[in-house]
Amino acid sequence: MELEVPDEAESAEAGAVTAEAAWSAESGAAAGMTQKKAILAEAPLVTGQPGPGHGKKLGHRGVDASGETTYKKTTSSTLKGAIQLGIGYTVGNLSSKPERDVLMQDFYVVESIFFPSEGSNLTPAHHFQDFRFKTYAPVAFRYFRELFGIRPDDYLYSLCNEPLIELSNPGASGSVFYVTSDDEFIIKTVMHKEAEFLQKLLPGYYMNLNQNPRTLLPKFYGLYCVQSGGKNIRVVVMNNVLPRVVKMHLKFDLKGSTYKRRASKKEKEKSLPTYKDLDFMQDMPEGLLLDSDTFGALVKTLQRDCLVLESFKIMDYSLLLGVHNIDQQERERQAEGAQSKADEKRPVAQKALYSTARESIQGGAARGEAIETDDTMGGIPAVNGRGERLLLHIGIIDILQSYRFIKKLEHTWKALVHDGDTVSVHRPSFYAERFFKFMSSTVFRKSSSLKSSPSKKGRGALLAVKPLGPTAAFSASQIPSEREDVQYDLRGARSYPTLEDEGRPDLLPCTPPSFEEATTASIATTLSSTSLSIPERSPSDTSEQPRYRRRTQSSGQDGRPQEELHAEDLQKITVQVEPVCGVGVVVPKEQGAGVEVPPSGASAAATVEVDAASQASEPASQASDEEDAPSTDIYFFAHGRYWLFSPRRRRLRAVTPSHTGAPTDGRSWVYSPLHYSARPASDGESDT
């Protein structure tokens, strides 16, 4: 472990000396002369035309005479090269060591390696100035990377294979931002106090990620330091919240406060300005509308993250919100008359787990699983007040600000001049409560018109939609309702009531039907009830192996009844008639007269011819009255007599059989083993 001494610029907390303070210093002081020379060197020439941002300095970030960005007077190209050399060596060296559990002392270990310009037996030669590269808590950060599914080779390929890209609009923090060419990681320079606070935060951060990796908090993948020329430049590697391949039409930095929370005129002149709270409330008074499941998942994630930040006494953090307007991009493409560059190079999903906004609130990805790739690029589907389809990319940023003495003093001073509840700097408990209330009530709102449907990942997961184009996404009207009475299986087929659900089977299956067969084929029920399910032909039904059998009884030549076992024709259904026990039932005729049905104990079933086209219709329970009654007469034998029942005419009458004991028209008689008591069933196949 090494003890670091902060450089003289960092010890001042302000980070840099302004030009006015430098010119007012005493001319005889050596420090004042040094600062004057530095400022004069960075000042633009009088005869030349200054470039954009030339000669201006914000914190440690500045621009040299050639127009290149500098950080602590180190050029951006030098800093990028040193970062890639250092990370390439440390990560490669760490991957050769065996993995082990994270120990408490691992959070405070600092490894250091010297990189001379001429090279050494461990480091390659380079054309930069000699520098020392430090890695903070390498074992702990290796665990974090594994937790998010980032392999060492992928980490090295993203950071070291191609040059880093500097962001042109870094913000007002005075930091320099780099993004990898694959949009996977962001590299940000941090202050000494911020790096120190992150080191203290690591044990609690480790515990929080173990409990729940789905969070909107920054995902830290590494903390490093480049030491050169007496300067310590500390950088942190994080997840990229706003991918460059997705065009952001709006960008907001939201804190939940109102004091000076409006974008300046200078900021609005930028190509992609960063708007603030008052701008959001003015431009989007209706907020961002989400469906109920998405809103619930987002609110729970925000609530959990706010509690974590409050427990660490963190404040002054923000919600970075990027809005991609799908409808606006389609209008822009139609106006241009050609496809944009986004179509030429199809976006590739991020490799890290839980790195997108959609995964952070929804989950669904586990360690080692492949992430579903769709054209939403991890954005959260939403709708604005005008009904336009949006994709939201969100994340909580700037969490390395603790409520120290300087922040307490800042809040006290601002509270004396303005309303203390409106300023951004506040105690952590109040800040977290105000932040959560603003996000859950003003920014994000639940819309009753937007409904989600349970997907294959279970209830609460977002609706999985395969878009047709790079900017296609589901709209509000295309999302089916979640509270539907009709159940859908994975194939989208509707499930009808099965034989076991009715409780009174009339047909005995040869073999127990599978789950798919049970949901795709229904079985006949009793005629006394109002439901009549028409079986559908299943792929397992064949003429050689029918699914159902039935018994028939007929009179032989000697006058004795005979039983026969037949394979059930799939073009027929068997209906069983069950009179009420002990009560005579009168079936009215057309003129109102009736015939008394014999008492209980009589029961039979008949074969009813069904048209083949009717098998594709809905169950007869959805119809009623005479229109749904079978048109074919039903013959049955009860109490020593033959009876004929006409469902269409609702008439029951006794008939006289022929000398052979069978009906005159040659119809077959169906035997029901549940109610026929003259002869017990003896065939073993009837019990299958």
UniProtKB/Swiss-Prot annotation:
Gene3D superfamilies: 2-Layer Sandwich, Phosphatidylinositol Phosphate Kinase II Beta. Residues 525-534, 602-623 have a biased composition (Low complexity). The modification Omega-N-methylarginine is found at R459. Changing K188A: Reduces activity by over 99%. Coiled coil: none annotated. Residues 75-443 form the PIPK domain. Its EC number is 2.7.1.68. Residues 48-71, 525-565, 592-629 are annotated as: Disordered. The modification Asymmetric dimethylarginine is found at R459. The modification Phosphoserine is found at S554, S672, S682, S686. The modification Phosphotyrosine is found at Y635, Y671. Keywords: Acetylation, ATP-binding, Cell adhesion, Cell junction, Cell membrane, Cell projection, Chemotaxis, Cytoplasm, Endocytosis, Exocytosis, Kinase, Lipid metabolism, Membrane, Methylation, Nucleotide-binding, Phagocytosis, Phosphoprotein, Transferase. Catalyzes the phosphorylation of phosphatidylinositol 4-phosphate (PtdIns(4)P/PI4P) to form phosphatidylinositol 4,5-bisphosphate (PtdIns(4,5)P2/PIP2), a lipid second messenger that regulates several cellular processes such as signal transduction, vesicle trafficking, actin cytoskeleton dynamics, cell adhesion, and cell motility. PtdIns(4,5)P2 can directly act as a second messenger or can be utilized as a precursor to generate other second messengers: inositol 1,4,5-trisphosphate (IP3), diacylglycerol (DAG) or phosphatidylinositol-3,4,5-trisphosphate (PtdIns(3,4,5)P3/PIP3). This is Phosphatidylinositol 4-phosphate 5-kinase type-1 gamma. It comes from Rattus norvegicus (Rat).
